[in-house]
Every structure is written in structure tokens, then in C-alpha cells.
């Protein structure tokens, strides 16, 4: 099974990893909160390319930071982001310099994105579903209820719209295969 995220170690990961093996979630949350997404959020909400409102973007940033926190707490788990978090992650990756620096700050390594998880047949889809269920379980352990339409209304409903890529939450929609919904 391919993992959704893969890590490429930097030149000196041992001391970094040893430090975070003894860290608690508050310390990790504090480190994640040092990452500045203001430029990314401006692009998404105010630039000529803007497609999000500020409330949606703020919500996405909070959820993405939770995703990063979980990845730090459980580096061997294949987390599956929500569609909204996945979109924010994609935008973060596009700023390659900042993304690489942020990954090094948080993980001591580059976190690769594997956008094909769950599209290669039933077994791969089942692996995606199992990883998503584990993501929800660990999310709820650390942050409370996982965002749903009932809890977060339109923000979550917008986040759950059919997207034309397959690297986020499992879905029975045939759009899991790129181009199928067009």
C-alpha cells in the first residue's frame, strides 16, 4: 500500500526526531502555530485568483494545522485529509520554498504528497477507507468531533463538494477517478 504522505529525511534528522518523540501535543501545537499562512490565505481570498471567502480560508488553515499536528504526533500513519485540507495542502505545496522550509521546521524532513491513494481498484480504495477511519479516530482523540455538515454547516458542505482529484477523503462518487465527473 502506498502511503498518502512520505517523508524524505534531511541531513540531520536524528536529533529532531528524538526531540519530538519526547514532546507532548501542546509543544507540537505551539510549533505548528508558528507556521505563517498569511500569503497563502491572501492568495486564496484577495488576489485575482481568489476563490475562497475569509471564513472558509480561516477554517481550512485551522484544520490543516490539525492535520500537520497529527502527522507530527504519528509520523508513520498514512493520514487522509478532508477535501478542504487537501486543497489548502496543495496550495501550500505550490510555494515550494516555504513548503520545504515549513516541512523542515515541523518534521525535520520533506513531506511528500501521494495523490493517487485509493484510485487503483477495490483493495486500494479499502486501504484509503481504513486510513481515513484511522485519521478520524486520531483526530477525535486530540481535537474532538471530526468536522461534518452537522457540526460546521456550509463550511463543511463546501469542503465536501465533488473535486476532480483523488487524494482526499474516500467517496463512493465515481469522481474518485480524475475526469470521471466531467
Describe the residue ranges of each PLM region.
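Intrinsically disordered, low-complexity, repeat-rich regions
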Residues: 2-182
Amino acid at each position: 500500500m502506498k502511503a498518502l504522505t512520505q517523508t524524505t529525511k534531511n541531513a540531520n534528522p536524528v536529533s529532531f526526531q528524538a526531540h519530538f518523540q519526547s514532546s507532548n501535543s501542546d509543544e507540537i501545537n505551539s510549533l505548528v502555530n508558528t507556521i505563517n499562512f498569511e500569503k497563502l490565505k491572501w492568495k486564496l481570498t484577495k488576489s485575482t485568483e481568489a476563490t475562497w471567502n475569509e471564513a472558509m480560508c480561516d477554517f481550512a488553515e485551522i484544520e490543516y494545522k490539525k492535520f500537520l499536528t497529527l502527522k507530527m504526533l504519528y509520523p508513520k500513519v498514512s493520514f487522509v485529509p478532508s477535501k478542504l485540507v487537501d486543497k489548502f495542502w496543495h496550495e501550500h505545496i505550490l510555494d515550494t520554498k516555504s513548503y520545504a522550509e515549513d516541512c523542515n521546521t515541523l518534521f525535520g524532513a520533506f513531506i511528500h504528497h501521494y495523490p493517487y491513494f485509493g484510485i487503483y481498484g477495490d483493495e486500494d480504495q479499502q486501504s484509503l477507507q481504513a486510513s481515513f477511519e484511522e485519521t478520524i479516530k486520531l483526530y477525535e482523540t486530540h481535537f474532538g468531533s471530526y468536522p461534518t455538515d452537522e457540526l460546521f454547516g456550509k463550511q463543511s458542505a463546501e469542503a465536501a463538494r465533488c473535486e476532480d482529484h483523488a487524494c482526499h477523503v474516500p467517496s463512493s462518487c465515481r469522481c474518485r477517478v480524475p475526469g470521471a465527473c466531467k
